[in-house]
Protein backbone atom coordinates (compact mmCIF):
# COMPACT_ATOMS: atom_id res chain seq x y z
CA UNK A 1 0.00 0.00 0.00
CA UNK A 2 1.24 3.51 -0.73
CA UNK A 3 2.05 5.57 2.34
CA UNK A 4 -0.55 8.29 1.80
CA UNK A 5 -3.24 5.68 1.14
CA UNK A 6 -2.23 3.98 4.38
CA UNK A 7 -2.50 7.23 6.34
CA UNK A 8 -5.93 7.92 4.84
CA UNK A 9 -7.17 4.41 5.71
CA UNK A 10 -6.03 4.42 9.34
CA UNK A 11 -8.95 5.01 11.71
CA UNK A 12 -9.68 4.58 15.39
CA UNK A 13 -11.80 1.43 15.61
CA UNK A 14 -13.77 0.70 18.78
CA UNK A 15 -15.54 -2.49 17.68
CA UNK A 16 -13.65 -5.77 17.54
CA UNK A 17 -14.31 -9.28 16.33
CA UNK A 18 -14.13 -12.10 18.83
CA UNK A 19 -10.86 -13.55 17.51
CA UNK A 20 -7.23 -13.08 18.44
CA UNK A 21 -4.74 -11.59 16.00
CA UNK A 22 -1.91 -13.75 14.65
CA UNK A 23 1.30 -13.77 16.68
CA UNK A 24 3.36 -12.96 13.57
CA UNK A 25 1.25 -9.87 12.91
CA UNK A 26 1.64 -8.78 16.54
CA UNK A 27 5.42 -9.11 16.26
CA UNK A 28 5.46 -6.95 13.11
CA UNK A 29 3.30 -4.33 14.81
CA UNK A 30 5.53 -4.20 17.89
CA UNK A 31 8.64 -3.95 15.71
CA UNK A 32 7.07 -1.02 13.84
CA UNK A 33 6.47 0.69 17.18
CA UNK A 34 10.04 0.15 18.34
CA UNK A 35 11.30 1.70 15.08
CA UNK A 36 9.40 4.95 15.69
CA UNK A 37 11.30 8.23 15.78
CA UNK A 38 12.04 9.44 19.29
CA UNK A 39 13.95 12.14 21.09
CA UNK A 40 17.68 11.65 20.81
CA UNK A 41 17.30 8.22 19.22
CA UNK A 42 17.16 6.65 22.68
CA UNK A 43 14.59 3.97 21.78
CA UNK A 44 13.35 4.04 25.38
CA UNK A 45 9.88 2.55 24.81
CA UNK A 46 8.90 -0.73 26.43
CA UNK A 47 5.87 -2.49 24.93
CA UNK A 48 3.87 -5.14 26.79
CA UNK A 49 1.33 -7.08 24.71
CA UNK A 50 -1.66 -8.53 26.56
CA UNK A 51 -3.58 -11.26 24.73
CA UNK A 52 -5.63 -12.59 27.65
CA UNK A 53 -9.20 -11.33 27.16
CA UNK A 54 -10.03 -11.25 30.88
CA UNK A 55 -6.86 -9.29 31.67
CA UNK A 56 -7.54 -6.87 28.79
CA UNK A 57 -11.01 -6.29 30.25
CA UNK A 58 -9.61 -5.76 33.78
CA UNK A 59 -7.02 -3.24 32.59
CA UNK A 60 -9.63 -1.53 30.41
CA UNK A 61 -11.82 -1.04 33.48
CA UNK A 62 -8.85 0.37 35.41
CA UNK A 63 -8.21 2.71 32.49
CA UNK A 64 -11.53 4.50 32.95
CA UNK A 65 -11.82 4.18 36.74
CA UNK A 66 -10.21 7.56 37.47
CA UNK A 67 -11.59 9.27 34.36
CA UNK A 68 -14.36 11.76 35.12
CA UNK A 69 -16.44 11.16 32.02
CA UNK A 70 -19.28 13.31 33.31
CA UNK A 71 -17.03 16.38 33.06
CA UNK A 72 -17.10 15.92 29.28
CA UNK A 73 -20.88 16.02 28.95
CA UNK A 74 -21.78 17.35 25.53
CA UNK A 75 -18.52 16.20 23.97
CA UNK A 76 -18.97 13.94 21.02
CA UNK A 77 -16.63 11.43 19.39
CA UNK A 78 -18.66 9.08 17.21
CA UNK A 79 -22.22 7.83 16.85
CA UNK A 80 -21.03 5.00 14.59
CA UNK A 81 -18.40 3.75 17.06
CA UNK A 82 -19.15 5.38 20.41
CA UNK A 83 -16.31 6.14 22.78
CA UNK A 84 -16.43 6.10 26.57
CA UNK A 85 -17.29 9.81 26.33
CA UNK A 86 -20.31 9.16 24.09
CA UNK A 87 -21.73 6.18 25.96
CA UNK A 88 -21.47 6.06 29.75
CA UNK A 89 -22.63 2.43 29.75
CA UNK A 90 -19.26 1.37 28.28
CA UNK A 91 -17.34 -0.12 31.21
CA UNK A 92 -13.95 -0.82 29.61
CA UNK A 93 -11.74 1.74 27.95
CA UNK A 94 -10.48 -1.04 25.68
CA UNK A 95 -13.81 -1.77 23.94
CA UNK A 96 -13.39 -5.56 23.93
CA UNK A 97 -10.17 -5.55 21.90
CA UNK A 98 -8.58 -9.03 21.92
CA UNK A 99 -5.03 -7.64 22.12
CA UNK A 100 -3.88 -4.57 24.03
CA UNK A 101 -0.33 -3.22 23.91
CA UNK A 102 0.79 -0.98 26.76
CA UNK A 103 3.52 1.48 25.78
CA UNK A 104 5.80 2.48 28.66
CA UNK A 105 8.33 5.30 28.81
CA UNK A 106 10.58 7.00 31.35
CA UNK A 107 8.62 8.96 33.96
CA UNK A 108 10.99 11.92 34.19
CA UNK A 109 11.96 12.38 30.54
CA UNK A 110 10.61 15.51 28.87
CA UNK A 111 9.70 13.78 25.59
CA UNK A 112 8.45 10.49 27.02
CA UNK A 113 4.78 11.06 26.16
CA UNK A 114 5.53 12.26 22.62
CA UNK A 115 7.88 9.32 22.06
CA UNK A 116 5.25 6.85 23.28
CA UNK A 117 2.58 8.24 20.98
CA UNK A 118 4.98 8.17 18.01
CA UNK A 119 5.54 4.50 18.85
CA UNK A 120 1.78 3.92 19.16
CA UNK A 121 1.01 5.61 15.84
CA UNK A 122 3.61 3.50 14.04
CA UNK A 123 1.89 0.46 15.55
CA UNK A 124 -1.53 1.66 14.39
CA UNK A 125 -0.22 2.25 10.87
CA UNK A 126 1.32 -1.23 10.82
CA UNK A 127 -1.98 -2.72 11.97
CA UNK A 128 -3.79 -0.92 9.16
CA UNK A 129 -1.25 -2.23 6.64
CA UNK A 130 -1.95 -5.75 7.92
CA UNK A 131 -5.72 -5.29 7.64
CA UNK A 132 -6.28 -5.07 11.40
CA UNK A 133 -8.27 -2.60 13.48
CA UNK A 134 -6.59 -0.37 16.04
CA UNK A 135 -7.27 2.47 18.45
CA UNK A 136 -4.89 4.59 20.54
CA UNK A 137 -5.91 5.10 24.16
CA UNK A 138 -4.44 7.59 26.64
CA UNK A 139 -4.55 7.62 30.46
CA UNK A 140 -1.70 5.13 30.76
CA UNK A 141 -0.14 6.34 33.97
CA UNK A 142 -3.50 6.56 35.75
CA UNK A 143 -4.36 3.00 34.73
CA UNK A 144 -1.66 1.43 36.90
CA UNK A 145 -1.47 4.07 39.64
CA UNK A 146 -3.71 2.10 41.99
CA UNK A 147 -3.80 -1.03 44.15
CA UNK A 148 -5.09 -3.46 41.48
CA UNK A 149 -2.92 -2.03 38.68
CA UNK A 150 0.48 -1.69 40.38
CA UNK A 151 1.15 -5.46 40.74
CA UNK A 152 0.95 -5.87 36.97
CA UNK A 153 3.99 -3.60 36.57
CA UNK A 154 5.99 -5.91 38.84
CA UNK A 155 4.70 -9.01 37.03
CA UNK A 156 5.77 -7.51 33.69
CA UNK A 157 9.14 -6.42 35.16
CA UNK A 158 8.66 -2.77 34.22
CA UNK A 159 11.73 -0.91 35.52
CA UNK A 160 11.37 1.66 38.29
CA UNK A 161 11.07 5.10 36.77
CA UNK A 162 8.93 3.87 33.86
CA UNK A 163 5.20 4.52 33.51
CA UNK A 164 2.54 3.55 31.01
CA UNK A 165 1.99 6.40 28.57
CA UNK A 166 -0.65 4.96 26.24
CA UNK A 167 -2.22 1.81 24.84
CA UNK A 168 -2.74 0.42 21.36
CA UNK A 169 -5.84 -1.72 20.93
CA UNK A 170 -5.59 -4.34 18.19
CA UNK A 171 -8.07 -6.70 16.64
Residue ranges and their predicted role:
Residues 10-14, 34, 56:
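Short, cationic motifs built from Arg/Lys/His that form the positively charged side of catalytic pockets
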Residues 1-27, 43, 165-171:
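Specificity-determining recognition surfaces
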Residues 46, 140, 166:
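Residue-level "edge-of-site" marker
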Residues 67-73, 80, 152-171:
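A glycine-rich helix N-cap at a beta->alpha junction
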Amino acid sequence: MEFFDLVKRRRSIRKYQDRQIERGDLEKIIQAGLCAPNAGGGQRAIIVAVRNRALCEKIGRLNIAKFNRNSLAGSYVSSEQPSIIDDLSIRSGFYGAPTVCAVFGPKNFLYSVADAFCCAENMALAATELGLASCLIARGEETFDNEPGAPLLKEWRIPDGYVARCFVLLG
